[in-house]
From Swiss-Prot:
Record membrane topology: Multi-pass membrane protein
GO MF entry, a single one: phosphatidylinositol-3,4,5-trisphosphate binding
Name of this protein: Phosphoinositide-interacting protein
Organism expressing this protein natively: Homo sapiens
Keyword Acyltransferase: no
GO biological process annotation, one example: regulation of sensory perception of pain
Cystine pairs: none
Length: 137
């Protein structure tokens, strides 16, 4: 491919429908504004529900799946069922049990991580305000 044909190829690509979907180049400041973690850049306080919503949902779903697994496992060992149903229940019960326990533990571990992030964010905001106080004088 020669240098003369390269710009023509680019012109054809710019007219394609995919070129309309491409974003224009952004500066660093506009990238910060459109970043996913926009809450880092805003100073509005968030409620506890907004902060801990995801771990609470994960723990609730994990607890429900764990309870379902316990019930199925208990039924598999207490009921007199056919061999086929019994073998299915003995496989599915512990599967739900372990999945629920895993989700419950993930939610429980997530809470201290969020608390640590909140403390770090508070310290960061304090240091930022202290820095701006001394720099404006």
């Amino acid at each position: 491919m020669t240098m003369e044909t390269l710009p023509k190829v680019l012109e054809v690509d710019e007219k394609s429908p995919e070129a309309k979907d491409l974003l224009p180049s952004q500066t660093a400041s506009s990238l910060c504004i459109s970043s996913r973690s926009e809450s880092v850049w805003t100073t509005t306080p968030r409620s506890n529900w907004e902060i801990y919503r995801k771990p609470i949902v994960i723990m609730s779903v994990g607890g429900a799946i764990l309870l379902f697994g316990v019930v199925i496992t208990c039924l598999a060992y207490t009921l007199k069922l056919s061999d086929k149903s019994l073998s299915i229940l003995k496989m599915v019960g512990p599967g739900f049990l372990s999945l629920g326990l895993m989700m419950l533990v993930c939610g429980l571990v997530w809470v201290p991580i969020i608390k640590k992030k909140q403390k770090h964010r508070q310290k960061s905001n304090f240091l930022r305000s202290l820095k701006s106080f001394f720099l404006t004088r």
